[in-house]
A protein has these predicted regions:
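Bacterial N-terminal signal peptides
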Residues: 5-15
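Short acidic linear motifs
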Residues: 17-420
Length: 420
């Protein structure tokens, strides 16, 4: 078989001094670890390519997989150009090729060859087949690496084309089963001008129309990347959800809004379980506060005042609870609940217990800023409350709507846009 001249140029671009005409590599044994990467890559490629015309050779995929790990030394642009040309010449044996590439992509996600290969539908099918094998199902970290690689591979597809849409929806369908958030996190932190953000979020909004999927993904996100949820939320918010016309359309999608709702509830549940280990009375308190769906339920809440004081004044600060239960299609009607002791503190204050909850608050701030078309907003939600609120009415800094509170129940809640 004759190799395309472009492929030969690719392979010979790196120095391969010392490679003799009679050199052979045993495809049934591991690669020579003491050889320079360029030499190993050259030897393997020279041995593998002719064997694509011998389907009975089951070592082809393994050898190509070994070659994949060495392609980081080859410029990505060259990989893109010359891999595509080579694929055209290998049509009869692509299944074997893709199998090897998929195996390599799972184990070496940073390989340039792995990253670009995701642009090819047949490769994506082979990659999914590899993931379904037992060895990959039992290695969740490896799965997450492969998903992240796919996210990077999306950079090299035209996401505005029908093929690009197929890539996005295929990615969502496969990756949402496990570790979706890792790929989304990577994409969320990229420049929104890349085109990946709008296309991915558009697909996500459709995916999240399914409430069960929403809950599952929200739980996965909050459990798997709890310390990094701030990056996920902030990245999605600043890159796409809250910018420009496309952002406005996505923002108005109930499914996108509901995702924040599900994530907020997952965080609250996680926090409740953490607090439950510390003080036995906290679960009942949180359980009473968190499922609030309307103001009437808030008004009906009655708790022992001493418990509330013990709960919040045991710590250095008071506590806040964010309820995300009132999603509206045109945004989020967010109820903020602050329980405080007036005799100890004249101003209701909000307590941030870690980066995760702060990130949800930041997402809310960005949401409100977008809705009200304001240019600047406070970095901390506590800054939004007046230093000396009136005794009976506090104004919501974001919407200039009055906040009602009950001195007896020590509750502060916001009034929605419709006055409820």
């Amino acid at each position: 078989m004759n190799l395309p001249s472009a492929l030969l140029a690719l392979l010979l671009a790196a120095p391969v001094c010392g490679v003799d005409a009679d050199d052979r590599v045993d495809l049934t044994s591991p690669i020579e670890r003491n050889l320079p990467p360029e030499r190993n890559a050259y030897i393997i490629w020279r041995e593998v390519v002719p064997k694509f015309h011998s389907p009975e050779d089951e070592n082809v995929a393994k050898a190509l997989h070994d070659f994949t790990r060495f392609t980081e030394s080859i410029p990505l642009d060259e990989v893109r150009q010359k891999l595509a040309a080579w694929l055209d010449s290998m049509e009869p044996n692509l299944d074997r090729l893709y199998e090897g590439l998929a195996l390599g992509a799972c184990e070496f996600p940073e390989s340039n060859l792995s990253v670009y290969a995701f642009s090819f539908p047949a490769f994506r099918r082979a990659w999914e087949a590899q993931l379904l094998r037992a060895r990959f199902q039992s290695e969740k970290g490896l799965y997450a690496q492969a998903v992240e690689t796919l996210a990077k591979g999306l950079r090299f597809a035209d996401l505005n084309s029908s093929a690009g849409g197929d890539i996005i929806h295929w990615y969502i369908g496969v990756a949402s089963r496990n570790h979706l958030q890792r790929g989304v996190r990577w994409i969320a932190m990229q420049d929104s001008a890349s085109g990946a953000i709008p296309a991915l979020l558009a697909a996500l909004s459709g995916l999240f129309d399914d409430a069960a999927v929403r809950r599952s993904v929200a739980a996965e996100w909050t459990n798997y990347v709890l310390p990094d949820l701030n990056d996920v939320i902030s990245g999605l918010a600043t890159n796409q959800l809250f910018q420009g016309a496309d952002g406005a359309r996505l923002l108005n999608r109930a499914a996108c809004t509901n995702l924040l709702v599900e994530m907020g509830e997952a965080v609250i549940e996680n926090t409740r379980l953490t607090w439950a280990k510390q003080e036995p009375f906290l679960p009942d308190t949180i359980r009473t506060l968190c499922p609030m769906q309307d103001v009437d339920k808030i008004r009906d809440i009655t708790r022992d005042a001493s418990l509330n004081e013990k709960w919040f004044w045991n710590a250095d600060t008071v506590t806040k609870v964010i309820n995300l239960g009132q999603a509206r299609e045109n945004g989020v009607g967010l109820i903020l609940v602050a329980i405080y002791a007036p005799e100890r503190e004249s101003t209701p204050r909000l307590y941030f217990s870690g980066r995760t909850e702060t990130s949800l608050t930041r997402a809310y701030l960005l949401l409100r800023a977008h809705q009200l078309r304001a240019k600047e907003w406070p970095a901390q939600l506590s800054d939004a409350l007046p230093a000396n609120p009136p005794p009976d009415v506090v104004l919501d800094y974001f919407s200039n709507q009055p906040l009602r509170y009950s001195r007896e129940r020590r509750l502060l809640w916001s009034v929605g846009p419709d006055g409820t």
